[in-house]
From Swiss-Prot:
GO terms for cellular component: TAT protein transport complex. This is Sec-independent protein translocase protein TatA 1. It comes from Aquifex aeolicus (strain VF5). Part of the twin-arginine translocation (Tat) system that transports large folded proteins containing a characteristic twin-arginine motif in their signal peptide across membranes. TatA could form the protein-conducting channel of the Tat system. It is a single-pass membrane protein. GO terms for molecular function: protein transmembrane transporter activity. It is found in: Cell inner membrane.
């Protein structure tokens, strides 16, 4: 897998800064963090449901 070079990451961050502006970055970061958190919860919830189904079938 190809990872971006440091100068590419800096360029991406500058583009994000220009698009959203410095005042919006905390809001964007918060929204992104909440989205990732909800995604992880949804994944773990599906795994728990699958585990419950397997236990019910095995009983």
């Amino acid at each position: 897998m190809h990872f971006p070079l440091p100068w590419q990451l800096i360029l991406i961050l500058l583009v994000i800064l220009v698009i959203f502006g410095a005042s919006k970055l905390p809001e964007v970061g918060k929204g992104l963090g909440e989205g990732i958190r909800n995604f992880k919860k949804a994944l773990s919830g599906e795994e728990e449901e699958k585990g419950k189904e397997v236990k019910k079938e095995g009983e």
